[in-house]
Amino acid sequence: MIQVYGIPNCDTVKKARKWLEEHGVDFQFVDFKKSPPQVETISKWLEQIPLETLLNKRGTTWRKLDEQAQAAAATVDGAVKLMAEQPSIIKRPVLEKEGRFFVGFSEENYQEIFSK
């Protein structure tokens, strides 16, 4: 089963979910707010996704963090712990398909992912 991780009111997540529905793709949505990803899950994502991609330093959640919290994210372990505690700083959506992980949404990427 394809899983989409994110926050329901995020515009990018909405676009991804709409695209999947319009293309008849069955998927399960995992809401970060109701079911935050565990350290193990985030670590698994990082096996395929670079930390700089997964950790969203452009969002308001990141900017609201104090310097100490931001500094803790300089290490992989610190970043994983921070993402588990503050899932809003994870770039969204995270798509899981057949053991592969993808971050963000663009129609072109989704067309390529689902043409295989």
What spans do the regions from the language model cover?
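Local sequence-structure signature of Cys/Sec-based thiol-disulfide redox active-site neighborhoods
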Residues: 1-23, 28-32
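Thiol/selenol-based redox catalytic cores and closely related redox-interacting motifs
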Residues: 32-116
